[in-house]
Structure formats: structure tokens, C-alpha cells
């Protein structure tokens, strides 16, 4: 089965990793959910003749620990992917949802490895950021298709 979502290319548009001088390797590492943020967006690109629909998906990741939090690094990363949608005759809202959930998930997985690789080169051990779900339930105004009954 061919995937309805194809990643054409991706790039990191913003990235910074800072080793924190206040980190104490003798103490346990602290992680606070409120110090970690993830956001995403999906934008349909202008159509080009004889090509399937393209979308730009962007994922922003940021970890900014408070001074008293014992964590080895603060970091931020923005990754952008250009995706092609192979689904024909689909509702635009369904394609946008596919891009926001699946496209963002693909980019987030890549981001986890980029952040791990960059922190591995720092003075403290490398970190692997937590997994993240971009799933959002369908809005209430989108009802599932009705089942047809044969007569």
C-alpha cells in the first residue's frame, strides 16, 4: 500500500542548544512539563500544474528550564517539511488534518534524533526528548459517514 503522505524534503530553520552551567550531574535530572513546549502548523502551498498537492508542515520545540531546575541543557528547534499528498478527491479539512497529525509526527521523530545528537556532543550526557502526540479528535461538526443498508 502506498502511503498517502510523502516527505519530499525537510530542513532545520532554527536550532540552539545551550549547556547549563547551573546543572549538577551529582543530582537527579529534573523535568517539568511546563518548561517544555511543542507547536505545529500546516500550510497548503500554491498548486503547480500536473503535481499533487503540497504542504509545508512546521514543528517548533522548545525547552527552557527555570534556573532552579536541574536539567543539563536548554534548547529550541524548528523543523520544516515539504510533503506531497497522494490522496485524490479528499476533503481539504481531511488533508490538513493528515498533515498536522502525521506530517508533524514524522518531523518530531526527526527532531528527537537531532536534539539527541547535538546534546550528546555537549559536556553532559545526551538527552532524548519525550514522545509527543499531535492527535486531536475530529471537531464535533464532522460526523462519521452513515452506514448504508441494503434493501
Sequence positions of predicted segments:
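N-terminal intrinsically disordered, cationic/polar leader segments
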Residues: 1-106, 113-151
Amino acid at each position: 500500500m502506498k502511503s498517502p503522505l510523502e516527505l519530499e524534503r525537510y530542513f532545520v530553520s532554527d536550532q540552539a542548544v545551550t549547556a547549563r552551567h547551573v546543572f549538577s550531574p551529582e543530582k537527579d535530572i529534573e523535568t517539568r512539563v511546563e518548561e517544555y513546549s511543542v507547536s505545529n502548523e500546516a500550510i497548503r502551498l500554491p498548486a503547480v500544474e500536473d503535481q499533487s498537492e503540497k504542504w509545508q508542515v512546521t514543528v517548533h520545540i522548545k525547552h527552557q528550564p527555570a534556573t532552579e531546575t536541574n536539567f543539563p541543557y536548554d534548547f529550541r528547534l524548528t523543523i520544516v517539511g515539504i510533503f506531497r499528498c497522494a490522496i485524490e478527491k479528499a476533503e481539504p479539512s481531511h488533508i490538513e488534518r493528515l498533515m498536522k497529525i502525521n506530517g508533524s509526527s514524522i518531523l518530531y521523530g526527526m527532531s528527537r534524533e537531532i536534539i539527541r545528537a547535538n546534546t550528546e556532543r555537549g559536556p553532559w550526557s545526551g538527552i532524548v526528548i519525550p514522545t509527543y502526540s499531535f492527535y486531536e479528535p475530529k471537531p464535533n461538526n464532522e460526523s462519521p459517514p452513515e452506514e448504508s443498508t441494503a434493501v
